[in-house]
């Protein structure tokens, strides 16, 4: 019987498939654009930037909370929060802020289900 994956492994796997989905969802012919500075590059060279930090499970895998960002904006400019909020609009930014403050406890099987959902979504993007 295979060893049950650790919680950390499950979360990392979900982060990986979710990030790829976000970046590929916005790509046209493999090229995506940074939401904050408009830099265009291949989706593999860009990142999935979070408006509300990944530490908040309530919004960590919320598709409205995550957009394509270049490494400069996402890492070195701390996500360019002001420009990100401007892109989202005040109401959506406030909604995500409130949602991020809610307590969410996801079970391992729920995270595994989300992995399968995003794998299916990636397959749909390929068609």
What do these predicted regions represent?
Residues 54-68, 89-100:
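Short microdomains enriched in Cys/His and/or Lys/Arg
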Residues 38-42, 66-91:
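Short Cys/His-centered divalent metal-binding micro-motifs
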Residues 3-7, 55, 73:
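Residue-level detector of alpha-helix boundaries and kinks
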Residues 15, 25-33, 62-66:
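Short metal-coordination and nucleic-acid-contact micro-motifs, chiefly zinc-binding Cys/His arrays
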């Amino acid at each position: 019987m295979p060893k049950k994956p650790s919680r950390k492994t499950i979360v990392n796997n979900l982060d990986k498939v979710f990030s790829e989905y976000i970046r590929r969802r916005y790509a046209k012919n493999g090229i995506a654009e940074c939401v904050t500075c408009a830099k265009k590059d291949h989706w593999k060279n860009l990142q999935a930037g979070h408006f509300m930090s990944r530490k908040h499970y309530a919004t960590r895998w919320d598709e409205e909370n995550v957009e394509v960002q270049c490494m400069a904006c996402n890492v070195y400019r701390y996500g360019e929060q002001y420009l990100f909020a401007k892109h989202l609009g005040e109401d959506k930014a406030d909604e995500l802020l409130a949602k991020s403050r809610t307590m969410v406890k996801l079970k391992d099987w729920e995270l595994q289900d989300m992995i399968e959902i995003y794998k299916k979504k990636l397959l749909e993007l390929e068609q």
